[in-house]
């Protein structure tokens, strides 16, 4: 398993941890978001817009942190995790 180097970003009171991952010609940034009890992973891809984050984003939360995940996002995360 590849060891990720996490970089910290701060957006107001929101702390974000980001790590770069490269695979199959694609580059993804993975941001681990922690805000109080809320925790999530944000997956950035190419050519997608998001109103909050400056790059394209696939966003989901960890089910144990907040139960708002849906199947599509969950499957996306499983697919990207295979590249790490």
Predicted regions and their residues:
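Mixed-charge, Lys/Arg-enriched low-complexity segments
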Residues: 1-10, 41-84
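Short N-terminal "domain-start" leader segments
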Residues: 1-46
């Amino acid at each position: 398993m590849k060891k990720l180097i996490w970089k910290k970003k701060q957006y107001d009171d929101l702390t974000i941890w980001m790590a770069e991952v490269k695979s199959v010609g694609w580059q993804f940034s993975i941001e681990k978001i922690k805000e109080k009890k809320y925790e999530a992973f944000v997956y950035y891809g190419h050519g997608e817009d998001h109103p909050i984050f400056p790059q394209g984003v696939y966003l989901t939360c960890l089910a144990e942190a907040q139960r708002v995940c849906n199947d599509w996002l969950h499957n996306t995360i499983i697919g990207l995790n295979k590249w790490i």
